[in-house]
């Protein structure tokens, strides 16, 4: 598989998981770089991932919970709508990760049945395994 490169032009960044160009906000840049790392360094495929996926089972009241990046063990698991394997929450590079951010993301992971959670601002990464 060819390397996935982050593409930016005219204030936009290409989102391969959505198949479209988005405004290149700082958090979006971190998100797209993380997706490229997942593909290029860890061997995940785009067809086993989703971006900004609404989570069911969230206890956020009337609001909606969206996971920045979701990874399933395989495309077949994603297509069968099985529990996610990994939930990733990203923040802009200049945003310090706080314990509240970590708990928010880990709750998203638990709600979705994921086994693993990662929070990243590109500089610092936190992660947890959830044993079921």
Show the residue positions of the predicted features:
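A short, conserved, highly charged catalytic patch centered on acidic carboxylates
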Residues: 1-116, 123-132
